[in-house]
Amino acid sequence: KKRGVYVAIVSSGVDIFVGAIANMLKVDDWVANGFEWDDEGWLLGGLPTRVLTHDKGIMVEKLARINGFKPSQIVSVGDSSTDLSMRIEGSKFIGFNPRRKRALEAFMEADVPVVEEKNLSLIWPLIFPGEEIP
C-alpha cells in the first residue's frame, strides 16, 4: 500500500470472515458471499451469490471498472485452481502457496509464476521485477 498499490480481496468465502481479515489487513476493498440473519441472530439462508467460485473474474472486472484500472495494471494472487478465474484478459496472475496438488498443476498448465512457500514477500519481485522491498 505504501507503494500506491490498490489491494482488494475477491473471495467466494463468507463475508463475515473475509470482512474481518480485510479489516485486519486494511485492504482497500473486498467482496465475498454472505448470509441473511433474522433479528434474533438465526440464520435465514444465503444471500444471492456475489462471487462465483469458478468465475471470480466478474468481480475483478467490476473492481477494475469502478476504479478505472486497465487490465495490464492488475495482478491477482491466489492459492487454488479456481482462483485462476481472476486472471482477466490482459492481467497477470501469481499462484501463491498452493496447498493442493491440483492447484499447483493448474498453475503450471496456465504458465503462471508460482510461489510455493508461505512467504508473501516472495511475490514482490514478480510484481516489481528488479526492485527490493522498501
Question: Predicted segment positions?
Answer:
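C-terminal cap/substrate-recognition subdomain and adjoining C-terminal extension
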Residues: K1-P134
